[in-house]
Amino acid sequence: MNEPGVQVLKSGGVGVLLTDTLYGLVGSALNKKTVGRIYRIKGRNNKKPLIILISAIEDLKLFGIEHDGKTEKILKKFWPGPVSIIMPCAKKRFEYLHRGTQTLAFRLPAKKTLVKILKHTGPLVAPSANPEGLPPASTIQEAKKYFGDKVDFYGRGGVPKAKPSTIINITDNKVRIIRK
């Protein structure tokens, strides 16, 4: 795969990519050091978990998340698409991701090029590409102004949808909208 940054991401690097919603500051969700680096680069509150992009529903198993038929129906109703779904994950080894909330938010994007990248890299954390408290970058140039050489690569440009994902919570088998 020739997409810029795939090898960098596979080896624990951090970059900026256009996701299905906004530009994201991305890195491997399965690499604790990478996730910590993203928190530092972004200046993000350590208590706020990150959204994880996945390439298929089966990727949830990587995080120890099993789901029943009812949950599967909910997932298939909203995915693929710009909806992040909060699910229970009390696994201690993923504390660096859930930050004590014992839940994780996942999104399976509809953007085919992004899903192709995810198939090669594995799940990625992808908070918006901006320092905490500032507006999300709307161009690669803006992201470069924010992060300069603190990241390992910048992906190809493009026009973001300019709206963050909807977030729903299904931890109690009910669909609750957290952010629309």
Language-model features and meaning:
Residues 1-180:
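Active-site-adjacent structural elements in enzyme catalytic cores
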